[in-house]
Design a protein with these regions (language model features):
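Short helix/loop capping segments that flank catalytic or ligand/cofactor-binding pockets
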Residues: 43-45, 84-85, 172-173, 247-249, ...
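Extended C-terminal subregions enriched in glycine
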Residues: 63-67, 196-214, 289, 297, ...
């Protein structure tokens, strides 16, 4: 990505992903560019562009306040298929065992067994280092450990527990280089350290195992490396009132580069404690609803000026017909 400040155009270079030959490289230019490459993709692209001075005015807050949803991925599995847990909707229910914790049971479709490679035995708390506790648990329960290595019919035997919390902990993601080239690195950020052990999640996994006649399980990252794992990385391009406090404004426009917008999970600045997909969708729909129609005046204040509430802009030629269930109605287009 590059920017032509004289003509206020952004240039995006594209190529066919994964191709060794016939990459079909081309450059697309436009006055407005919406960046939505998921958190790690967006951060990598913007950090690269800032380091190479292609987007030199990006905020120094880029990569700060990256959230993991304060998550743990646990579960329970039976040695053999007694009940096919792969049948049904992926997520149908959830519980809130306390004020900050949210647990969702998750199922994978039949044949979706690759995630089982990240699963292992559950390792609880103790005074010894966690890798040593893992080794002791594997040695004292060899049959359970060996069964955890098998991914045969894993999705049919397993109930996954997605444990999420709305606590204030974060990471900072930076661009670092070595002989192999630049790569992303993370360090502890704002708030409490990211948890590698959630007692309430472990209790839920043990209760689930008891209910299905199986054994509780955790993830390799946590059990062996004492490093948390997440399915919902968020933040890094947080909203602020200026480049000193955020990367984008409340309309999700990038400070320092008019015409560039970020509309994905990197704009979410908090641990939600729930699956973030609908939040990301709602934030993006809100940002897009404030864009002017082509040829009309922009109702938003200029980039860098204080936020003010404005009414959503009705589309001139809506893609959804007026009588359709999802049509924009008068009550849904108020000031935001």
């Amino acid at each position: 990505m590059d920017v032509d400040h004289l003509r206020r155009l952004h240039a995006v270079d594209t190529e066919r992903p994964g191709a060794w030959i016939r990459r079909r490289r081309r450059t697309i230019t436009g006055e407005q560019v919406v960046l939505s490459a998921a958190v790690l993709g967006t951060l990598r692209l913007l950090l690269d562009a800032r380091a190479e001075r292609r987007l030199p005015h990006l905020s120094e807050r880029l990569g700060h306040v990256v959230r993991t949803n304060s998550e743990a991925i646990l579960g329970a599995a039976t040695p053999k298929v007694t009940t096919d847990f792969s049948r049904g909707v992926a997520i149908t229910s959830s519980i809130h065992p306390d004020a900050v914790t949210h647990i969702e049971p998750v199922r994978y479709g039949r044949g979706s067994n690759a995630m089982g490679l990240l699963a292992t035995i559950l390792v609880g708390p103790g005074r010894l280092p966690r890798p040593l506790r893992f080794a002791i648990a594997a040695a004292t329960h060899p049959r359970t450990f060996l069964q955890s290595l098998s991914v045969r019919r894993w999705s049919e035997r397993t109930v996954i527990l997605l444990v999420m919390q709305s606590l204030d902990n974060s990471l900072r993601i930076m661009l670092r280089g070595n002989r192999r080239g630049p790569h992303l690195r993370s360090t502890q950020g704002h708030g409490e350290p990211n948890p590698t052990y959630l007692p309430i999640g472990h209790r839920a996994a043990r209760l689930a195992a008891e209910a299905i006649g199986g054994v509780p399980g955790g993830s390799l990252n946590e059990s062996i490396l004492d490093i948390p794992i997440t399915a919902h990385i968020l933040g890094g391009c947080c909203i602020g009132d200026g480049p000193g406090t955020g990367v984008i404004d409340a309309y999700q426009r990038v400070f320092g580069h008019p015409g560039l917008h970020v509309c994905d999970g990197s704009a979410v600045s908090a641990n939600l404690g729930v699956n973030p997909s609908l939040t990301i969708t709602a934030m993006t729909e809100r940002a897009m609803s404030l864009w002017p129609n082509r040829g009309e005046a922009d109702p938003r204040p200029p980039l860098g000026e204080p936020y003010r509430r404005i009414a959503a802009v009705p589309p001139r030629t809506p893609a959804v017909p007026a009588g359709a269930p999802a049509a924009l109605r008068a009550g849904s287009a108020g000031a935001v």
